[in-house]
Every structure is written in structure tokens, then in C-alpha cells.
Design a protein with these regions (language model features):
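Class I S-adenosyl-L-methionine-dependent methyltransferase catalytic core
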Residues: 1-187
């Protein structure tokens, strides 16, 4: 993969990010949870001004303020209780309960929306979570927050997942997709 680090757990395809950047043609892009740098690499190739932040570099989106405004934000947060990136208590994936996770995620999404320029786009890549037979449709909760004008929902197929390597007993059906929610801040 020419973007980011394909061995980084939770990495997304740079081709998705590139398609979004080529479609929306932003001047300033923010990725507040940049992980392995996929969005950074795409922006470098497309010659778009980029700002990347991440908890591993000392930026905590829940508690820290974002400096500047952006006309495109790509947000691919960690999911609750799936991948443990480290033991940092501020890592969303380490939230002890689903409700605490969703509360922190809502703070993040609200901050990002406020950081958007008028007419700007917030793209959120999010999947569903299954635990103990229950489905947690994260995308649906975000949509119900009504943070801006939802203009598109893209269903993205997932590849190279650890769940593909696992044998499940019973009638468990693994999740093989994520959603890209496209919100627009009205001009």
C-alpha cells in the first residue's frame, strides 16, 4: 500500500482518502487521529496542506483544543473494545463502557464540526461493533446527533481483517464493512 503503514492495526485504504480529497478538492485537511499517516501521505501526493494529530504524538482530541480551521476533515476513530492501541487512559478504545466511549466520541465529533470552515466537509469512517451477541451500530448513533447536513453514506468493504482469520462457533456472521459518513457545514 503506497499510503500509511499497512501493518498498522486499524489502517484504512489510502485510495479511499484519495478519492475523497480528489472529489472535494480541499485546501486544508485535518486528520485528528492520523495513526500511521495514511491521510498525510495522500495529502503530500495531492499537494494539499495537511495537519495531522494523534494521541501517540501527545494530542488528545477529547481534552485538547484544535488550532486553526479546515475545509476537509477525515476522522477514523478507534472503536470501543476492539483494537487496544496502548494502555493510555485517553485512548477512546480503552473506554470502560460503551456509553463512556460514545460520550467521548460525541465530544470529538462536535469539536471537529466546530473546526470546519463554512461549506467544509467532515468525513467519518466508522464501523459497527458486536459484543456478546449485541450489535452496536456506531454510525447510526453519530447520524442521530444531527451535527450537520448529512449528504452521503458510503459503504466501504473491509479487507485483511483479523476476524477473517478467526473460526467462530455458532451463527456468528463477521462484519465486513464500514461506513463513511459525509457531513457538510452549511455556508
Amino acid at each position: 500500500m503506497p499510503y500509511g503503514d499497512s501493518s498498522y492495526r486499524g489502517n484504512c485504504s489510502g485510495y479511499l482518502v484519495k478519492d475523497l480529497i480528489c472529489h472535494f478538492r480541499p485546501a486544508r485537511v485535518l486528520d485528528p487521529m492520523e495513526g500511521s499517516g495514511t491521510t498525510r501521505d495522500v495529502c503530500r501526493e495531492c499537494k494539499v496542506q495537511y495537519t495531522g494529530m494523534d494521541l501517540k504524538n501527545g494530542f488528545d482530541l477529547v481534552n485538547d483544543e484544535i488550532k486553526g480551521t479546515f475545509d476537509f476533515i477525515f476522522f477514523h476513530p478507534p472503536y470501543w473494545d476492539i483494537i487496544k492501541y496502548d494502555g493510555d487512559q485517553h485512548d477512546l478504545s480503552n473506554s470502560p463502557t460503551y456509553d463512556i466511549f460514545m460520550g467521548k466520541l460525541r465530544i470529538c465529533v462536535s469539536k471537529l464540526y466546530e473546526t470546519l470552515e463554512r461549506g467544509g466537509t467532515l468525513a467519518i469512517l466508522i464501523g459497527d461493533k458486536k459484543k456478546n451477541g449485541d450489535l452496536y451500530p456506531l454510525f447510526n448513533e453519530i447520524i442521530n446527533w444531527r451535527i450537520g447536513r448529512l449528504t452521503q453514506i458510503i459503504i466501504k468493504e473491509q479487507h485483511n481483517m483479523r476476524s477473517n482469520e478467526t473460526s467462530y462457533s455458532g451463527s456468528f456472521i463477521p462484519i465486513h464493512h464500514e461506513y463513511v459518513l459525509i457531513f457538510r457545514k452549511e455556508a
